[in-house]
Amino acid sequence: MPRADEVDLTDYLKELPVGTVVQVVNTQTGEIVTGTTLTPVDDTIPQNTEGVECMTLAITPTNASNKLLIQVVANSSHSASNPTYTVALFQDNTVNALAAIASFNSDASAGRPLSRILNHFMTAGTTNLTTFKVRIGANVGGTLTFNGIAGARYYGGVMASSITITEIKA
């Protein structure tokens, strides 16, 4: 009897109906990341040099035509008052973001943490290993803290951010 890692699932995957979940990969982290690189809030596509890289997750799609649903939950705070945060999603070494969201911290006090959610749906386009990266930046000077406040962890590491990638048969 072959081991599970020796079984070729190619024929089985071809028989799945459209819309079936083929695989799910996930990373969740409570790790603290800090940085000071700004992300402008303007009408340009965020670049892979802006903000701070906070999380990455790799997937090897089973079919280039399949769809990928990428779901990001990102917790962060900033040392400045009233920052506008940008959360941007990148793939491999591509310079331009695939998707981005902005959120404004309307509380006048610095350091208030916010959770942001970004969802992106796309065609896989490859059957090679591909890595998705999340970068977060603010539009004002100061220090961004990912998963905490003022460079410190909160809630014992369970204030966690995540990336989940679901491959869906096309």
Predicted regions and their residues:
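Extended, low-complexity regulatory regions
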Residues: 55-59
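Terminal beta-strand-rich extracellular "head" domains
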Residues: 37-44, 61-170
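Short, solvent-exposed loop/turn segments enriched in Ser/Thr/Gly
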Residues: 51-53
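Glycine-rich, low-complexity segments
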Residues: 1-38
